[in-house]
Amino acid sequence: MSERPEHGSHTLRIYSKPGCHLCEIMIEELLPLIRGRLDLEVVDIESRPDWMQDYGTRIPVLEFNAETVCEAKLDVTAIQRIIAQHTSS
């Protein structure tokens, strides 16, 4: 796979592209869960041909610390686990 952009230790990254309905749904469901706890970086896969090749048929792909958390549908349990392990409340 191609090189991933740098991100902070409390940042989720979603690989997406404009007009991706599943991506929009995942972001909409994710934001209330992470607000004030984790950051979200939206990566447009159309900005690089290698990302289009790697993620084009898999989006949305959600990653944390360069590990895939879920694809296509939000895994709420996985997000709750990440929040519990990586944030202080």
Regions found by a protein language model. Give the residues of each.
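Structural micro-motif
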Residues: 56-62
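A structural signal for the main folded, soluble domain(s) of proteins
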Residues: 19-24, 38, 69, 73
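Non-catalytic, surface beta->alpha helical segment in thiol-disulfide oxidoreductase systems
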Residues: 65-89
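Local sequence-structure signature of Cys/Sec-based thiol-disulfide redox active-site neighborhoods
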Residues: 2-32
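Short, well-ordered coil/turn elements that cap or connect secondary structure elements
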Residues: 35-37, 56
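Thiol-based oxidoreductase modules, predominantly thioredoxin-like and allied folds used
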Residues: 38-49
